């Protein structure tokens, strides 16, 4: 958890009681207006092919690899045998109550033998500040959005690319 643990727990309880399982629960999580999402996603699309993005992505993935190794020191994973028949690309989902959840998912998938792992995250996570924001933008992530144009055009291309590579 990034924020105050007790506040996060209370926010999770509230979200669950309201059946809002995709609600932001970390204190200070970005909440974006439609025009902010538009600008953020347009920048994401345009910047992804830039040299600077590729360098930052490489650095973020190296950090994430080291981080998932550290997660392994304090995390026990069970049920990996259920993945033994998966022989090709796959889509793994989880309900991200915390932007740190992808570290756990990456660790489990690496332990299961998968090497290329892309994480789907909320578009608003691209607006996070600091180290966690950097990782959300560059560690092989694919934003999902409530914006119809993005989900109809860009997101399917990202999924196809992740499954083909």
What is the predicted role of each segment?
Residues 1-90, 98, 161-164:
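Membrane-interfacial terminal anchoring regions of lipid-handling membrane enzymes
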Residues 74-165:
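Soluble catalytic domains of membrane acyltransferases
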């Amino acid at each position: 958890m990034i924020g105050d643990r007790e506040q996060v727990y209370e926010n999770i309880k509230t979200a669950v009681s309201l059946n809002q399982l995709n609600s932001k629960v970390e204190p200070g999580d970005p909440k974006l207006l439609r025009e902010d999402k538009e600008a953020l996603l347009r920048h994401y699309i345009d910047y992804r092919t830039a040299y600077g993005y590729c360098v930052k992505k490489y650095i973020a993935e190296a950090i994430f690899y080291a981080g998932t190794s550290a997660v392994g020191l304090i995390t026990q994973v069970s049920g990996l045998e259920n993945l033994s028949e998966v022989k090709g690309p796959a889509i793994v989902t989880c309900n991200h109550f915390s932007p740190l959840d992808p570290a756990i998912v990456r660790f489990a998938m690496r332990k299961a033998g998968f090497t290329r792992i892309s994480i789907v995250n909320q578009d608003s996570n691209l607006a996070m500040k600091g180290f966690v924001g950097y990782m959300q933008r560059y560690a092989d992530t694919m934003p999902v959005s409530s914006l119809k144009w993005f989900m109809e055009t860009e997101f399917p291309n990202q999924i196809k690319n992740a499954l083909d590579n």
